[in-house]
Swiss-Prot record:
BTB domain: residues covered: 24-94
Main subcellular localisation: cytoplasm
Organism classification: Eukaryota, Metazoa, Chordata, Craniata, Vertebrata
Function as written in the Swiss-Prot or TrEMBL entry: Substrate-adapter for CUL3-RING ubiquitin ligase complexes which mediates the ubiquitination and subsequent proteasomal degradation of TCHP, a protein involved in ciliogenesis down-regulation. Thereby, positively regulates ciliogenesis, playing a crucial role in the initial steps of axoneme extension. May also play a role in endoplasmic reticulum calcium ion homeostasis.
Entry keyword Cytoplasm: yes
Protein name: BTB/POZ domain-containing protein KCTD17
Origin species: Homo sapiens
Expression sites by tissue: Highly expressed in brain. Highest expression is observed in the putamen and the thalamus.
Location in or out of the cell: Cytoplasm
Clinical condition linked: Dystonia 26, myoclonic: A form of dystonia, a disorder defined by the presence of sustained involuntary muscle contraction, often leading to abnormal postures. DYT26 is an autosomal dominant, progressive disorder characterized by a combination of non-epileptic myoclonic jerks and dystonia. Affected individuals manifest myoclonic jerks in the upper limbs during the first or second decade of life, and later develop dystonia with predominant involvement of the craniocervical regions and sometimes the trunk and/or lower limbs.
Gene transcribed to yield this protein: KCTD17
């Protein structure tokens, strides 16, 4: 309650400590204007500056000659704050700025009031910056007998705007068919991206179709690449099997089995025998003109058949 001149006021000591405890009424001198309220109202928000002010002597504050607490703030915005603590609603005059009330609410640390004012300011900003609605217009040409049916069947947000009589273009016998131009409109609901909901849905569906088509093309390309790779591998294998140069690259044959009664033959023996068999016989020495000088030293010691006639001494 704001104290006005000529009004009856509680005793001067109502703002201070009375005998036996604190008084019920509290005076607040805000910027030269005295407000009178109850201690219960000020203690509505436990974490606020006003609640701490009237709960004890922890928060030191000066007082005037009447015992009212001195608060150096603007009294213009203190009235809505005090009313909010009384009934929990924010009531502002038309000429009162919400920014000023918000500044005072932050000073007094009244959390619920701060949130309410910020929400209201955001709503106003959104309303101011909101894009005005846009309309799409269509002009339909119809005959008189079709006009009633067309207007009655309009739906999906289309609205009749104007009807223009353009006379008759055709003459069938004695009766003329009057024709009209019917102007209809539809509101486009804007989205945060600046597109209407209908156009955004169409754009989205088109993008999805393009993505699906691109995915299908990529899958087809992968399958074709795999088929070409398989065909190339098969062709390469066929060519390598027909090339005689690749015969040497065949895997080695397994070793022959062990003989029935012994160990495995030495690997070099077959080659040695083959070399001996394949080696040419020694050339016969030319026959000397001298008679054979072979003379057996003892009877019965004759030269072998392949050495007879060669003149080789024994």
């Amino acid at each position: 309650m704001r104290m006005e001149a000529g009004e009856a006021a509680p005793p001067a000591g109502a703002g201070g400590r009375a005998a036996g405890g604190w008084g019920k009424w509290v005076r607040l001198n805000v910027g030269g204007t005295v407000f009178l309220t109850t201690r219960q109202t000020l203690c509505r928000e436990q974490k606020s500056f006003l609640s701490r002010l009237c709960q004890g002597e922890e928060l030191q504050s000066d007082r005037d000659e009447t015992g009212a607490y001195l608060i150096d703030r603007d009294p213009t915005y203190f009235g809505p704050i005090l009313n909010f603590l009384r009934h929990g609603k924010l009531v502002l005059d038309k000429d009162m700025a919400e920014e000023g009330v918000l500044e005072e609410a932050e000073f007094y640390n009244i959390g619920p009031l701060i949130r309410i004012i910020k929400d209201r300011m955001e709503e106003k900003d959104y309303t101011v910056t909101q894009v005005p609605p846009k309309h799409v217009y269509r002009v339909l040409q119809c005959q008189e007998e079709e006009l009633t049916q067309m207007v009655s069947t309009m739906s999906d947000g289309w609205r009749f705007e104007q009807l223009v009589n353009i006379g008759s273009s055709y003459n069938y016998g004695s009766e003329d068919q009057a024709e009209f131009l019917c102007v209809v409109s539809k509101e486009l609901h804007s989205t945060p991206n600046g597109l209407s909901s209908e156009s955004s849905r169409k754009t989205k569906s088109t993008e999805e179709q393009l993505e699906e088509q691109q995915q299908q093309e990529e899958e087809v390309e992968e399958v074709e690449v795999e088929q070409v790779q398989v065909e190339a591998d098969a062709q390469e294998k066929a060519q390598s099997s027909q090339d005689p140069a690749n015969l040497f690259s065949l895997p080695p044959l397994p070793p022959p089995p062990l003989p029935a009664g012994g160990s495995r033959p030495h690997p070099l023996r077959p080659e040695a025998e083959l070399a001996v068999r394949a080696s040419p016989r020694p050339l016969a020495r030319p026959q000397s003109c001298h008679p054979c000088c072979y003379k057996p030293e003892a009877p019965g010691c004759e030269a072998p058949d392949h050495l007879q006639g060669l003149g080789v001494p024994i």
